């Protein structure tokens, strides 16, 4: 399978995690390609039983497609663990490197890498690393945006976008840190948080990319 086709599969999976309907237009926007290019790739993937079309939800991954996506995430996240723990990469440096390597390393290499790393369960961003042959199921999946209730929350996972990671680095926010939600303003869509005795005003868009666990 080509790296381009693998990227399309991951894109469809990620869109499905964010919005209820996966359209040609949304795929084109995220892949930064033309709608006709998406249409052509969609036809190929449908012929290979990687995706199917649903009237309500748009394009969906088949079990074959989901198996391939899960393996891509497994490779990607194991590589990220290796880069951080053995090559001293920072969390905002690893995503792009892993994006390249995930398409080139062999299954044998990944199995040896996983064993060497001690079979980690999560990547440096808190994302689940599925076992070989298993579907990806995120264990840390409660967005901060859905926790409007005041209280203390444990940061368990973050999206691996460069801008978000630089924002978190600026405020020294790391996986495993405690975030105290003071209030949520419905008008401005702003969360007021306390982190390490510092008050932070966090937008709803950022809160959607932070995953937490209620502590009290």
Regions found by a protein language model. Give the residues of each.
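Mid-protein regulatory/catalytic core that forms ligand/cofactor-binding pockets
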Residues: 102-209
């Amino acid at each position: 399978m080509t790296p381009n086709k693998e990227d399309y599969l991951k894109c469809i999976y990620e869109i499905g995690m964010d919005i209820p309907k996966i359209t040609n237009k949304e795929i084109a926007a995220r892949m930064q390609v033309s709608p006709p290019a998406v249409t052509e790739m969609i036809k190929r993937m449908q012929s290979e039983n990687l995706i199917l079309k649903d009237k309500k939800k748009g394009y969906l991954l088949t079990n074959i497609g989901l198996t391939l996506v899960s393996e891509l995430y497994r490779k990607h996240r194991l590589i990220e663990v290796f880069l951080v723990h053995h090559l001293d990469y920072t969390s905002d440096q690893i995503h792009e490197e892993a994006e390249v390597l995930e398409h080139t390393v062999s299954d044998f290499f990944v199995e040896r890498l996983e064993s060497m790393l001690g079979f980690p369960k999560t990547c440096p961003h808190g994302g689940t690393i599925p076992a070989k042959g298993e579907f990806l199921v995120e264990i840390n999946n409660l967005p901060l945006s859905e926790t409007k209730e005041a209280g203390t929350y444990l940061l368990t996972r973050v999206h691996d976008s460069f801008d978000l990671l630089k924002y978190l680095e600026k405020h020294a926010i790391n996986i495993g840190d405690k975030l105290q939600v003071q209030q949520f303003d419905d008008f401005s869509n702003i969360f007021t948080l306390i982190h390490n005795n510092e008050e932070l005003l966090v937008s709803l868009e950022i809160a959607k990319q932070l995953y937490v666990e209620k502590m009290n």
